[in-house]
């Protein structure tokens, strides 16, 4: 018989780039998880905005099993039916004319930045290579995307970094305007900064970026890795703003827990990419595509998207009630089911401690930096699960406050 797996095994065997919780989940259903000891958790973390339909959704399992019984992989010398169906669904539902599939948000953003550089190179010349991104952004962990991210703590130890990337202040169109010029090939922005604290962009800011990109012949890239696939109550967050990007990246919820990412592009942008200019071995594989196709089918409905907006109200109303009782937060913000509770000055820097108390109470939440407790639950989380989970979160807040901040 094999040895039991324990949390200590992680510290023995894994490269230590993560610091996971002390418990190991072993089973999930809907918005509930159970650990090795059988303890139940209400999951408001959603695998960091990935598990858009909860755990072990029966229709996703069916889609995966059906494709798994046929074939798993061929490589990109061949196409397959599930990926073509998925591409058509994304094209029909968005501004895009073309799609490139990959395995993660970082890969999708890498592809977008490469496409933008090539578009400018082919059309205007090699001098037009500048990328403008934003402070406190997050676009992934490849060297290119982590450099674009605007958080030096993630990139400073990996120098020399890719050149010609500058960072403006988020939600500050004057700061962006000072950096965007005729040497700029692209501007990359999150409609809501997720890792940066759940900070929604203003409408004027995104409209201003669109106008600046038009003026300087730069591509506008929306990183919707975290905000996409129904998370905000629209299929993609750009739909809230009436601002259409040239390129859009999507991943996380697109696979509902199965790894998949995509770059959506207009025909004009896609045309610069020819055979051999980019690729990835597993991109568009039939397993991921079959699952993602079912995810889109289930999420892109008025009932589901309106339900996200309703659930937003459930969360915000109850979180404000909790805050009225314990006085932890200066603000509750976000769109749809991407919600951030900003700690007030008395509790600054202690979001991690609150998330740990929450886990002890049987509810999983996220953080977004040291000052924001983040919620990214399944889009179909039930009212009972919201009530139970927030009861547990309230108990965690009470315990945190009663023991005193430290």
UniProtKB/Swiss-Prot annotation:
EC code: 2.6.1.81
Gene3D superfamilies: Aspartate Aminotransferase, domain 1, Type I PLP-dependent aspartate aminotransferase-like (Major domain)
This protein's record includes keyword DNA damage: no
Needed cofactors: pyridoxal 5'-phosphate
SUPFAM superfamilies on file: PLP-dependent transferases (SSF53383)
Keyword tags: Aminotransferase, Arginine metabolism, Pyridoxal phosphate, Transferase
One Pfam family recorded for the sequence: Aminotran_3
Keyword Transferase recorded: yes
Catalytic activity: N(2)-succinyl-L-ornithine + 2-oxoglutarate = N-succinyl-L-glutamate 5-semialdehyde + L-glutamate
Function recorded in the entry: Catalyzes the transamination of N(2)-succinylornithine and alpha-ketoglutarate into N(2)-succinylglutamate semialdehyde and glutamate. Can also act as an acetylornithine aminotransferase. Is involved in the utilization of arginine as a nitrogen source, via the AST pathway, and also seems to play a role in ornithine catabolism.
Protein's name according to its UniProt entry: Succinylornithine transaminase
Gene it is expressed from: astC
């Amino acid at each position: 018989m094999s040895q039991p797996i324990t949390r200590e095994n992680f510290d023995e065997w894994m490269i230590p780039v993560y610091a996971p919780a002390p418990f190991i989940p072993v089973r999930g259903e809907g918005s509930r998880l159970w650990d090795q000891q059988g303890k139940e958790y209400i999951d408001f973390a959603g695998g960091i905005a990935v598990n858009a339909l909860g755990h072990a959704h029966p229709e996703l399992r069916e889609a995966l099993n059906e494709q798994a019984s046929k074939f798993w992989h061929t490589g990109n010398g061949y196409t397959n039916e599930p990926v073509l169906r998925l591409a058509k669904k994304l094209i029909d539902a968005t501004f895009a004319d073309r799609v490139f599939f990959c395995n993660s948000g970082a890969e999708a953003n890498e592809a977008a930045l490469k496409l933008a550089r090539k578009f400018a190179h082919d059309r205007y010349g090699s001098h037009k290579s500048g990328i403008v991104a934003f402070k406190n952004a997050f676009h992934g962990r490849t060297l290119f995307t982590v450099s674009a991210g605007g958080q030096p703590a993630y990139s400073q130890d990996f120098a020399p970094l890719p050149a010609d990337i500058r960072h403006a202040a988020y939600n500050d169109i004057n700061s962006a305007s000072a950096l965007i010029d005729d040497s700029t090939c692209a501007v990359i922005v999150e409609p809501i900064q997720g890792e940066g604290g759940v900070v929604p962009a203003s409408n004027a800011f995104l409209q201003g970026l669109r106008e600046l990109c038009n003026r300087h012949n730069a591509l506008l890239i929306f990183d919707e890795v975290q905000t996409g696939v129904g998370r905000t109550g629209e299929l993609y967050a750009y739909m809230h703003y009436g601002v259409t990007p040239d390129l859009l990246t999507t991943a996380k919820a697109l696979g509902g827990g199965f790894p998949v990412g995509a770059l959506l592009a207009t025909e004009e942008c896609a045309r610069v990419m020819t055979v051999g200019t980019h690729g990835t071995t597993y991109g568009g594989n039939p397993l991921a595509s079959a699952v993602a196709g079912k995810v889109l089918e289930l999420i892109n409905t008025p009932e589901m998207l309106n339900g996200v907006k309703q659930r937003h109200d459930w969360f915000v109303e109850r979180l404000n009630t909790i805050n009225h009782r314990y006085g932890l937060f200066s603000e509750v913000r976000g769109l749809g089911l991407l919600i951030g509770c900003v700690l007030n000055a008395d509790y600054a820097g202690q979001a991690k401690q609150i998330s740990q108390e929450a886990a002890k109470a049987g509810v999983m939440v996220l953080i977004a930096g040291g000052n924001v407790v983040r919620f990214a639950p399944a889009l179909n989380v039930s009212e009972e699960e919201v009530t139970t989970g927030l009861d547990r979160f309230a108990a965690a807040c009470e315990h945190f406050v009663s023991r005193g901040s430290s």
